[in-house]
Amino acid sequence: MSHAVKIYDTCIGCTQCVRACPLDVLEMVPWDGCKAGQIASSPRTEDCVGCKRCETACPTDFLSIRVYLGDETTRSMGLAY
């Protein structure tokens, strides 16, 4: 089952979320917005099972990555934009 995965610009490019994902949903891509010069990307959300291991692994105070499940998708993502 596919879930919406949102990467926020608070990402510090640490790769913790990418390494935590058991299904390789995430990857790092070049980005000039942080010192690491990279940001997480979610090109394979169709493989996301919603385990939220990426969220748990994120070391930022404000979770830089969020997985939205079912009704949570439209409700929460609507607030983010």
Swiss-Prot record:
Q: Which PANTHER family match?
A: PHOTOSYSTEM I IRON-SULFUR CENTER, PHOTOSYSTEM I IRON-SULFUR CENTER-RELATED
Query: What gene codes for this chain?
Result: psaC
Task: Give the protein name, as stated in the record.
Answer: Photosystem I iron-sulfur center
Q: Which PROSITE patterns match?
A: 4FE4S_FER_1, 4FE4S_FER_2
GO CC annotations, alphabetized: photosystem I; plasma membrane-derived thylakoid membrane
Membrane topology annotation: Peripheral membrane protein
The cofactor note reads: Binds 2 [4Fe-4S] clusters. Cluster 2 is most probably the spectroscopically characterized electron acceptor FA and cluster 1 is most probably FB.
The UniProt record gives the binding positions of [4Fe-4S] cluster 1 as C11, C14, C17, C58
Q: Which species expresses this protein natively? A: Synechococcus sp. (strain CC9902)
Q: State the organism's lineage.
A: Bacteria, Bacillati, Cyanobacteriota, Cyanophyceae, Synechococcales
